A protein has these predicted regions:
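Long, hydrophilic "mature protein body" segments
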Residues: 15-18, 56, 82-83, 89, ...
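Short acidic, S/G/P-rich loop/turn micro-motifs used as interaction or catalytic elements
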Residues: 21, 144-147, 200-207
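Ordered, small/hydrophobic-rich secondary-structure cores
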Residues: 1-80
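Short, flexible, solvent-exposed loop/turn segments with mixed acidic/basic and small polar residues
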Residues: 66-68, 123-131, 182-190
Length: 234
């Protein structure tokens, strides 16, 4: 069973012109709107997207969404944004009012499947005493973070001073008896990051798990990263 993203329904991005095409009159080339599809356990199964430019109007391209995450040149031109800012840009470029999200979804015509697999078992098979389930997720992101953005995350998440060498920032949340911890790490030497989230569930409120994953993903989007996929390891 597939479900839409548990957080804010759609993600918005601004696409900047190529460096050799930029002028004082054109600061934004277009807008991209995306939505992940997910299994009931919140792992990613696919991505829907639509793009808009003043010249072409609305169109859909899975290749564009892939390029936003894999093409180094494209990565420099894509900026995560809010719906409010996307509305302002859409209006400034002559598109008038940005359509409602229900209407935007009608432009999702080129679905990109994302391969999934049964959860890999990392860490202990049994949860600690007092919890009925242990889950581990990894959210992968493209683009890079500046030092001040990492510092902002450490402050927001109250990362202990020093921390661990493997993690750039960490956080913890206790909610109605459930415990969530997370670690932000750089992936290799490329422009990529991952957020590892461990959930120890005492209740049956899996909706809290979905909202926590979604909010953490959105926090990193607001800091400039582009989500790629959500995998489950336990």
């Amino acid at each position: 069973m597939l479900m839409p993203d548990a957080g804010p329904p759609l993600d918005y991005y601004l696409v900047l012109p190529r460096p050799d095409d930029r002028s004082s009159a054109t600061t934004v080339e277009g807008i991209v709107v995306e939505e992940f599809t997910r299994h009931h356990d919140f792992t990613t199964t696919g991505l829907d997207s639509a793009g808009w430019t003043p010249e072409a109007g609305w169109w859909s391209s899975a290749a564009l969404s892939r390029g936003m995450r894999t093409d180094p040149e494209m990565l420099t031109r894509v900026l995560p944004t809010s719906r409010r800012e996307a509305e302002d840009v859409h209006r400034a470029l002559g598109g008038w009012q940005l359509p409602a999200e229900k209407v935007l979804r009608t432009h999702f015509l080129d679905h990109q499947p994302i391969a999934t697999a049964p959860p890999l078992r990392l860490g202990p098979a049994q949860p600690p005493d007092g919890f009925h389930e242990r889950r581990v997720y990894r959210v992968l992101f493209a683009k890079d973070l500046r030092a001040e953005q990492v510092a902002s995350l450490r402050t927001a998440w109250r990362t202990p001073a020093g921390g661990t060498a493997a993690s750039a920032a960490t956080g913890r949340l206790d909610e109605h008896g459930d415990q969530f911890t997370w670690d932000l790490r750089r992936v290799g030497h490329s422009l990529a990051w991952c957020l590892d989230v461990t959930a120890l569930l005492r209740t049956d409120a899996t909706a809290a798990l979905g909202s926590t994953l979604s909010e953490l993903t959105n926090v990193l989007r607001r800091h400039g990263l582009i989500p790629v996929t959500t995998e489950r390891f336990a």
